[in-house]
Amino acid sequence: DFDLTYFPLKHLGYKCVVGTVGELYASLARPCSISVRLGISAKLDLPQISELWNGICSAASEHNITKADLDLIPSRNGLAISIVITGISSAKFSENRKSAQSKDLVCISGNVGAAFLGMSLLEREKRKFEKAGDVTGQPDLEKYRMLVGAYLKPELNPDIVGQFSDSSITPSYGYLVNRGLGDAVRRLHRDSGLGVKLYTDKIPFEGNSFEVGKILDIDPISAAMNGGDDFRLLYVIPLSQYETFRHDFQTFSIIGHIAKPDVGSVLVTPEGAE
């Protein structure tokens, strides 16, 4: 879902592609071709469609996608976007992938919760705008630029699969975090049959997340666990490769570990409460 009141069409096109390639990166596949279907209503004109397509092409180019197809179909109202991206995975990953073990590391590619806070800021400003009826004023969101940007134009490292290919590390599991960290952890628990422990003091946050959380009356930890659209990559890394991982993947944070099956999926506070 998206709200064109505050969502630039170019950013929307870009974000749709990033969200789709993220699923491929989670499984260590490289994207190679994209097929786009746009349902267009009479509410959108050619410049707007071009802006959306430019965003799609920008992201496709950034992620080294060399083939693109576009299909335009009529829509009774609004805008509908369908994107399919195909990718290729190296046999090396399948051959080297091992089952997860208790104490293996749960790692994430960047901060979480920022996108939900950014969206909440935009929704707040939209309500103010609608209440005031001021069509000339623009909200000042500069000091929240990182949070708003995390929602409107999330980014993923297009070289992540190459990094793993060059490394001796093969994750046992990988997920795109796009419906909250809690959702990804539940999927990991389900797929592995093992327990998962996350530690709240290890979860990375954007710098002013807690300040904004107070303003919006939103707990940033809850935003990280239950919010969406962060577009981060979560991998399970063998404990034996900790030193190599810390050296080769310095932008990642280790936020927890695999546990025994009877643990389930739990969040541990700094005081040790689960």
Model-identified regions with their sequence ranges:
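Helix-biased detector of long, well-ordered alpha-helical tracts
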Residues: 1-274
